[in-house]
């Protein structure tokens, strides 16, 4: 276990600046969005959007969300967190293992007193720490910005909803990253894992967000998309506990299944010299 924690520590120190830059960068974008909301008339925006065709509004969901500062922020930040950070996490997950195979250093790593389970487990542990810390920095900056905003203070600062949204974002991004990690244990190739991981991400986005425009007979395809189980508006604006519990449970199961699957496949995998 000493080697396990040592490996996690090495990866954290290696990526520490990336964590700060990414978390701080997304947090800065959030700060500007909060400042923008401060100067906007959200009610007027709702009136404008109400004139749009019904099919267009289905993509945004409840129109009243646009008139709520938390709703507008969630749509601008959390609904696109997969784009701001998810793609980078997919790339990181794809390269953590396969990079060592391609550089012919994996035999040296496995020759140390560490099992394959612990070796891959240390990289998966780092991946979740990476996601949790990056998103944690982003959420802290966002919370500070909201606490300083008169509009958000008037609406109320809901720490429990914010915490719920944080855990859902971590599990959502963790699931997207673990899809790429699972693929990387099969192909042991950064290019293949990244390409497939990003392709699956966009396919899931399409299925999870645009199923409402599909024929009713095939709309059940939405259930295979990770995006369908990520509904931050329902947590932050509507405080819908039932949907939150459902999403957290299913995302948790997906994460665990991908972790276990990755460990089993890597343990049985023949590593090329």
Question: Which stretches of residues belong to each language-model region?
Answer:
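Long, hydrophobic alpha-helical segments
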Residues: 73-99, 198
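Terminal transmembrane helical anchor/hairpin motif
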Residues: 7, 14-15, 32-72, 186, ...
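Short coil/turn motifs that cap or connect alpha-helices
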Residues: 115-116
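Aromatic- and glycine-rich beta-strand/loop motifs that create alpha-glucan
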Residues: 1-26
């Amino acid at each position: 276990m000493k080697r396990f924690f040592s490996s996690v520590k090495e990866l954290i120190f290696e990526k520490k600046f990336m964590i700060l830059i990414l978390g701080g960068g997304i947090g800065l974008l959030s700060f500007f969005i909060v400042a923008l909301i401060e100067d906007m008339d959200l009610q007027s925006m709702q009136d404008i959007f109400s004139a749009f065709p019904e099919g267009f509004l289905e993509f945004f969901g409840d129109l009243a969300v646009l008139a709520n500062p938390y709703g507008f922020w969630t749509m601008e930040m959390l609904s696109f967190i997969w784009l701001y950070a998810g793609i980078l996490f997919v790339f990181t997950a794809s390269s953590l293992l396969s990079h060592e195979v391609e550089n012919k250093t994996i035999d040296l790593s496995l020759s140390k007193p560490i099992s394959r389970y612990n070796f891959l487990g240390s990289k998966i542990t780092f991946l979740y720490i990476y996601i949790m810390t990056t998103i944690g920095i982003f959420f802290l900056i966002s919370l500070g910005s909201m606490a300083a905003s008169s509009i958000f203070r008037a609406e109320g600062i809901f720490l429990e909803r914010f915490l719920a949204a944080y855990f859902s974002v971590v599990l959502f991004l963790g699931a997207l990253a673990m899809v790429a990690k699972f693929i990387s244990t099969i192909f042991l190739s950064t290019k293949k894992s990244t390409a497939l991981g990003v392709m699956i991400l966009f396919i899931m986005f399409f299925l999870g967000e645009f199923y409402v425009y599909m024929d009713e007979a095939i709309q059940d395809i939405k259930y295979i998309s990770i995006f369908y189980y990520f509904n931050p508006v329902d947590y932050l604006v509507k405080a819908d506990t039932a949907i939150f519990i459902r999403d957290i449970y299913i995302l948790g199961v997906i994460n665990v299944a991908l972790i276990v699957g990755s460990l089993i496949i890597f343990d049985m995998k023949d590593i090329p010299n």
